[in-house]
Amino acid sequence: MKNELMQRLRLKYPPPDGYCRWGRIQDVSATLLNAWLPGVFMGELCCIKPGEELAEVVGINGSKALLSPFTSTIGLHCGQQVTALRRRHQVPVGEALLGRVIDGFGRPLDGRELPDVCWKDYDAMPPPAMVRQPITQPLMTGIRAIDSVATCGEGQRVGIFSAPGVGKSTLLAMLCNAPDADSNVLVLIGERGREVREFIDFTLSEETRKRCVIVVATSDRPALERVRALFVATTIAEFFRDNGKRVVLLADSLTRYARAAREIALAAGETAVSGEYPPGVFSALPRLLERTGMGEKGSITAFYTVLVEVDDMNEPLADEVRSLLDGHIVLSRRLAERGHYPAIDVLATLSRVFPVVTSHEHRQLAAILRRRLALYQEVELLIRIGEYQRGVDTDTDKAIDTYPDICTFLRQSKDEVCGPELLIEKLHQILTE
C-alpha cells in the first residue's frame, strides 16, 4: 500500500529539474528492457549502469518504462541501475559529414572523429504546407528511362518498387550521380555487411563519395538502430536543405525500416493489424516522409526503395507508401532476366509532377514512347509465334519497327550520364524519323 502511494505521488509531482531520476531493470527480453523508472517521457534517453550503455524509452505503463537499448541485450540482467538523462537523442549535422560513413545513431564508422558539427533532434516536425515552395524545376537524374517519361521534380518524393536481385543497388548508385544535386545522403538499412562495403568501395565513384554522407545500419544491428538510421539520414538532409542546398536523399530500404519498427512495436505489446504491421508503423510513415521535399530555400528530393514479393505492388506496405509519395519507379524482374538494365518498367512508372517540370515537346515525345511500348506489348506474343500480320494497323507497325531502338535508348551503363539536351535529341531521332 505504501509503495503504491509513493508511486502515485511521484507521478503527480515529478522531480524538479536537475534531480537525478533512476530505477532498476525488472525484465530483459531479446529486444526490450522493462524497468521501474517513474517520471520518464517517450523518447527519453537512459543510461544503464555500470556499463554506461544507452537505451531509449519506447513505452510507458504507469511507473514502468519499456526501453529499447542501443546495443544487444546480451549481458544485461535484472537489477541493473537505469538513470534517465532528461534529453532525447541528437544527431550530428554539418558540412564535415560529407565523404564520411556513420552508423544509425550518427557515430563515425571510419575511425575518425567528427569535428565542426552541430547537433539536432532526430525527430523534427515537417515544414508547414504553406511554407514549402512549390515544385517547379526538374531534377535530372541522368538516367534516360527516368528522365524521358517520368522526369522528377526538385523536391519530389519517389518510391522505387523492386523485388530482390533486379538491380536496385546499381540504380541507387546511378542516382547518386544526379548532375543537378549539390549533395547526397545515402542510408543503407538492414543490408549485409559485405554488400555495404562492396557498394561503397566499388559501386560508388570516388567523386560521388566526396559529396555524399553515408548512414549504415546493417542487418545484425539492433532494431532501434535500423529504425533510427532513416531518421538520422533525414535530419542530415534537412540541415543541407535549410542551408539552401539541393539534396538527394536515397533510402534503401523503407521495407527494412518498417520491419525493424514492427519488431519494436510488437515487443512493446502493439497488435498487428494490416499485413502483420502494427498501426504505429503506418502512423509514423507520413510524418517521416513529409519531412523531405521543398523547404523555404533548398530542397530534398527523396528516393525510397520498397521491396515487393513476386512483383506484388498491392501488398499493404507498398500500397501505403505509394499513396504517400509523389511518384514511383517500378523495376521488372522480366526485364532483368533479359539483361535489360536499368530494369525499369516504363509503363508502370509514374511521376506526378511530370506535367509541371517538362516542356510541351517533351510530354508529346514521352506520350509517343509510352504508346509504342504499350502497342508492342499487346502484340508481342503474336510476333513470337509468327501470327502477326503487318499492314493491319499502321501505329502497331511503327511500334514494332522502333521497338529495338527504344530498348537500346532505355538501356544504360552504370557510369553513363545523359544530359537533357541529348535526351530530347535522341527521342526525336527514334520517334519522329
List PLM regions with ranges.
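Glycine/charge-rich, flexible interdomain linkers and switch-proximal surface loops
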Residues: 20, 96-97, 147, 233
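Acidic-enriched and Gly/Ser
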Residues: 2-18, 24-141
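P-loop NTPase nucleotide-binding/switch module
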Residues: 80-82, 96, 109-156, 169-174, ...
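Phosphate-interacting basic helix/loop segments used at nucleotide- and nucleic-acid interfaces
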Residues: 6-9, 85, 141-146, 233, ...
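P-loop NTPase catalytic core
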Residues: 148-150, 155-433
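Short, charged, intrinsically disordered terminal tails
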Residues: 1-13, 422, 426-433
